Amino acid sequence: KMTQSEPMKPTACLALADGTIFYGHGFGATGETSAELCFNTAMTGYQEIMTDPSYAGQVVTFTFPHIGNTGITPEDDETVDPVSAGMIVKWDPTESSNWRATEELGPWLASRGRIGMGGVDTRRLTRAIRQQGAPHVALAHDPDGDFDIAALVQKARDFSGLVGLDLAKDVTCAQSYQWNEMRWAWPEGYAPQTAPKGGSRERRRLS
């Protein structure tokens, strides 16, 4: 099995059930988790993906390298808390640049017990996913870089998988609630708009 060369000080490790190991830089929560591994090719919407109920029990590999650069905006959550088990990215998240953001990706993951891992060859990892289906993995984040590789591989092999699980029960809200949020609006209001001369009614509806 091929093993990615270790960076100077790896603080995160991803172990596949077949023994393949990926090293990287951890962010978010510390600790270990086992899950199913999948990938997503979207260029935007990482927050929506992490909170999408359909990703429950899965570690998501993002093939687009710029993840985290728009921070976290509470209004963009698909559910109250992220349901994905963790995330794998090419480059470590940088400081966000988004006037709507209220939090950075790393602290947001940490406060919700989710592990992130950067510095990974996500193309190679995605090829492994395509070849193996949805491999079982163990993901670990330790600031000291102290990993028991054999134990992580065994943890990945011991993961029972998602087949047959009632995941809807885990991601559904505990009780009904009222939806009180309105359509988002610019807090300072909008300047008057002048419709172009000769513009169609359809164009005015869209403007």
Regions found by a protein language model. Give the residues of each.
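RNA-binding accessory domains that recognize and position tRNA/RNA substrates
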Residues: T3-S207
